[in-house]
Swiss-Prot record:
The lineage of its organism: Bacteria, Pseudomonadati, Pseudomonadota, Gammaproteobacteria, Enterobacterales. Transmembrane segments: none annotated. Residues 36-254 form the Radical SAM core domain. It comes from Buchnera aphidicola subsp. Acyrthosiphon pisum (strain APS) (Acyrthosiphon pisum symbiotic bacterium). [4Fe-4S] cluster binds at residues 51, 55, 58. This is Biotin synthase. The gene is bioB.
Amino acid sequence: MKKKWTLEETKMLFKKPFFNLMFQAQEEHRKNFDPNTIQISTLLSIKTGSCPEDCKYCPQSSRYKTGLKKEPLLEIEQILSAAKKAKDSGSSRFCMGAAWKNPKEKDMPYLEEIIKKIKEMGMETCMTLGTLNSTQAKKLADAGLDFYNHNLDTSKNFYNNIITTRTYQERLHTLHAVRSSGMKVCSGGIIGLGEKKQDRIELLMELSNLSIQPESVPINMLVKIPGTPMADNKDVEPFDFIRIIAVARIMMPKSYIRLSAGRHKMNDQTQAMCFMAGANSIFYGCKLLTSDNPEEKHDLELFKKLDLIPENKTQTLLKEDEYKTIIKSSKIKKDQYYNAAII
């Protein structure tokens, strides 16, 4: 029977002496994972900007002047080319994000074909497209989508300070639709939005007490973008962030805890402490949607220093003729692409 975390239990974890907390987190990590391996994902923005939502941290919102270049939905050849590059670089999962409040029905055939083609390349797939209804979730699942990302971002009580165009309950409904469809859930939050410690406690409680815990939990450090309302937020204290990773590992022992956005601002020592605290997944590549990320070369050097081995490193490379066959076999017609690409 799954443990249900109480407020008092979660508070006690946050109050633990730092090294005691780290020891407990590392123990939990070793019970469920090889401590010397790390899961690598690559994230691509397949449709950038012009989002109608008002998330105060996001440069893709049409409400803020951030200088972001808007881009329509990428053509399937561009997406598959990026997926091949990610696979050849060692990524086992290809994640795709579109700046929508939610996908429209005209988008679904295009999205389904993208999923099928990337699955043929031998990669896990993940998408983040906004809110989903149960019918859309089922279509994506039937196409072969492995994971769907929909973050809770912060606590229910603090949420309306960050976003007003989508309710917290809508986010929970989407997670329910994803879980009911048979897909795996990817859901986490952002640290540094101006939240209090209590909000961090409540966020981790909400995630850990879902009917089934998320298989993947991205923990993001706010990337402060000029032009957004959160551009001047205070920096997150590194040890506070490491503590959150450790508590997340203890509360969700079988989940992959992903060290996500903001990693490019962390030095090697902070990242190493996060891995020690139980983080065992990263995004690999120079961009996370529109935010910077450490260069691949630097990540490989860090892995070497820490003796970390990427998961599924033994996966076979995609041969050029196999890749060309996948491209040619795409059933997407130009009118389907143009219908989906309308902003």
